[in-house]
Amino acid sequence: MAGLQRLASHLPVGVMLPHNTTEAPGPHSAKQDSYEQGDSSQQSLKGHLRNNFQKQLLSNKELTLDKVYTHPKWNTHTKARSYSYPHCTGISQQDPESDSQGQGKGLFYSSGPQSWYPKANNQDFIPFTKKRVGVDRAYPLKPVVHRKSCSTGEAGTDGYHNVYPRPPEPREFSSRNFGVRNQGNFSVVGTVLAAMQAEKAVANFDRTEWVQIRRLEAAGESLEEEIRRKQILLRGKLKKTEEELRRIQMQKEQAKENENRELQKIILPRSRVKGNNSNTMYKPIFSPEFEFEEEFSRDRREDETWGRSQQNSSPFQLSDYRIQRLKRERLVASNNKIQDRVSELSVEKFSLPSETPGGALQGSARNSSLSMAPDSSGSSGSIEEPQLG
């Protein structure tokens, strides 16, 4: 008995121990002790084996279900398991005499960390798998068929039939198939999402392109407006410059006209004064001079027009035109000489006034000789002309 008490002190609370022989004396006490000792050793070995097997099964199930999806009822079941430990220990502590009755009814208390399990019925274990499988998420309206578990009449009084848990039902395979089907659905959903994302990306790209096009169009419109504005400004500047040039030309023309008028006003009074102050002897000298200049200018203009019109004429006409031109040049040279002599005589007359009548006679003689000089020069010119011809 001392040895049994020591074992009881080391063992956990939920382990079954044989009853004390002192409390139940009888004629068959030795046989009963040996039977109880053998029964306790067998129960401890079977409990350890069952616990190890259940741990392996639970770990495999957890791995498979974690791979497929996380079920919300998993946490609730683990909580129920955690809550079952103190409850079972409390029952074993409060009612030690009911251990034998529990064994008779099929209950079994393990010495490991697992909670107590009913020996005769495994219905608490089977619905756990059903709950973990749950409803198919792809088809939520599909009716769920719960398979009936084994009948409760399998529980025997000997307490050795349902010690080991039942093998995994085909529901686990259905859950695996469900995971594969979910993977297929996820692949379809992934393709749909990828297509939607591609459409969104294309839409965003089109939107960005449209925004860039609008910006470029706005920039082009602004540039066109600036070009138009600059063109208008340049046109205004050109008009102003043209008006200024016209005004400058008009001013120049007016200035030239005014200068010509002033020159005419200055020349005409001098000619009149000279005509009034000069003697009658000088009139035939000055009058033919001005007439000759006018005639020469007129002939020169006609010569220019005739030369332009007769550029493509015959060589005989050109030779006649050259002869006439030489004659006119000689006449101009003789006229210039006469003008020089007249100017010299006029200067001498105003510088040295005549004091004696003899001087006047000499001056008249000189004038007569000068008047005869142009006649002689004209005669000589007339004589030389046929020689040239």
Swiss-Prot record:
Residues 35-44, 90-102, 307-317 have a biased composition (Polar residues). The keyword ATP-binding does not apply. It comes from the Eukaryota. The keyword Coiled coil applies. Residues 368-382 have a biased composition (Low complexity). Keywords: Coiled coil. Residues 211-266 form a coiled coil. Residues 16-44, 84-115, 301-320, 343-389 are annotated as: Disordered. PANTHER family: ZINC FINGER C2HC DOMAIN-CONTAINING PROTEIN 1C (PTHR14649:SF1). Belongs to the ZC2HC1 family. This is Zinc finger C2HC domain-containing protein 1C homolog. It comes from Pongo abelii. The lineage of its organism: Eukaryota, Metazoa, Chordata, Craniata, Vertebrata.
